[in-house]
Amino acid sequence: MGCGEFSINFIRLFLKHPYVESVCVADNVPEKAKSFGEMFNVSYYDSFEKMLEADINAVAIFTPRHTHGPFVIKALQCGKNVYSAVPMASEVTHCREIVELVKKTGLIYMMGETCIYYPCSMFCKEKYQSGEMGNFVYGEAQYHHDISHFSEHHRNDLKAIGVPPFYYPTHSLSMVLAATGSYATKVTAMGYEDVEDDPVFKKGVNLWDNTISNAFSLMRLANGGVIRINECRRIGAKAPSSYISAFYGTKGGYQFSNAQHIFTQNKGEGVTLEDVSDYVNPIAMTENKDLPDFKQRVANHEWQWDSFAPIQDYKRLPKEYEDLKNGHMASHKFLIDDFCRAAYNHTLPTVNAWLAARFTIPGIVAFESVKKDGQPIDIPDCGEPPVE
C-alpha cells in the first residue's frame, strides 16, 4: 500500500522472494496504483479497502511516515500479516493497539527498520554480547538528515515535511537498543527552535504547528546505562545520516567518525586500540579507501547504499536476490527476507510489534519532554514478546 518513490525499492524484492506467490499494489490515488500495476505487471487497487478485501495474507505499508499507525491497525483487524515502513505509528495509543492486536490475533507485524542491519550497530552488538564491552555504560546515536537532502517531492510537501523530528526516531534508537538488548525507561529532551527563512518549521504550515527542527535527548535504559539520541533536520552534515558515534561499556568501547571505526579495550594500566574499519565499512568503501578524495566522497554518501559489509551475513539471503538492487547500507534485502520468512513460517520477525514499540514510543515521549523544556518523563513499555 502506497505507490511512491520509497516503495518502488521493495516491490521487486517481494516479487522475487521464494516464499511469495503473487504481489499486488494499491494507492488511494488511482493513477498511482495503475502506474505501479503496469510498471510491475501486477494487479492493482485504487483504495486500501479494496486491497484488504482481496485474497491476500500479508500487506506492506509504504504510506507517508506519519500515517502508518491507522493503516497497520486496519490491516491487522482484517486478518492480514503486516509489514510497515518506519515508524510503527505517531501516537503511543496506536503503538499499544498494534501490540494488543498482534497478541490477540497471533498475526505477524514487522516494522522495516533498516538500522538494525547497519554494520556499526551489528558490530557493537557483537562485541557487547561477547562480553568484551563489559556492562553497558553509555551510547550515542543520531539521525542527521538535513531537509535540503530530501527529495523535491518531500521538500514541497509543507504539511508533512515539518513533522517533529522525534516522531521519526527509530533509526537512531534502534541502533543502540538493538546492540544493548535493553529499552528506554525515562527521557529528558530539548529542541532547537528553527530560525531559517522558509516555511517548513512554522506554525500554521505543517500539520503539527511544529517549530522544532532539531531535537536532542538523554534516555535512561532498563539496564542502567544512558544513551544520547539526536534527531536533526537542519544540520550541516550529509553522510552517514544514521550512525552510532560512541558506544561504551565498563571494559571496552567503540568510536566512529566519517569512515573510521575504532574498538578499544581496557588492559591493565592502558588500552588496546584496534581499527576495525575494514570489517565494518561496506566492501565498496574499503576498496576505494586510498583515493585522495575518499573522505569527501564518504561525507557525500558514496558507497553507503547497496554494498554489503563483511560483518553482514549476506550469504544467507535467497539466491533470487543476487542481481536485485539493494539500499540503505544494504539493508533492504535483509528486511524483506526476514518478513517473508516470518510470515511464511509464522515466527516472530526481527523487529516484531514489541520491539517496534520500544524503537518508536521513546521518541514520541521525548517530544513531550521537548515541549515541556526538558522535563524528565517516564517512557511506557509494552513488554516482551511471547516465548516461541
Task: List each language-model region with its residue ranges.
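Hydrophobic residues in well-ordered beta-strands that form the structural core
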Residues: 46, 84, 109-111, 140, ...
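N-terminal Rossmann-like dinucleotide-binding module
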Residues: 1-40
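C-terminal glycine/acidic-rich active-site capping loop/insertion
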Residues: 114, 200-201, 207-208, 220-221, ...
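Glycine-rich, aromatic-lined ligand/substrate-binding cores of catalytic
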Residues: 178-199, 204-268
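Predominantly a Rossmann-like dinucleotide-binding segment in NAD(P)-dependent oxidoreductases
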Residues: 108, 115-210, 215
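C-terminal capping/lid region of NAD(P)-dependent oxidoreductase domains
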Residues: 107, 134-138, 368-388
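Beta-strand-loop-alpha-helix segment that lines the small-molecule cofactor/substrate pocket
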Residues: 57-58, 64-65, 69-116, 131
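Short acidic low-complexity segments
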Residues: 43-54
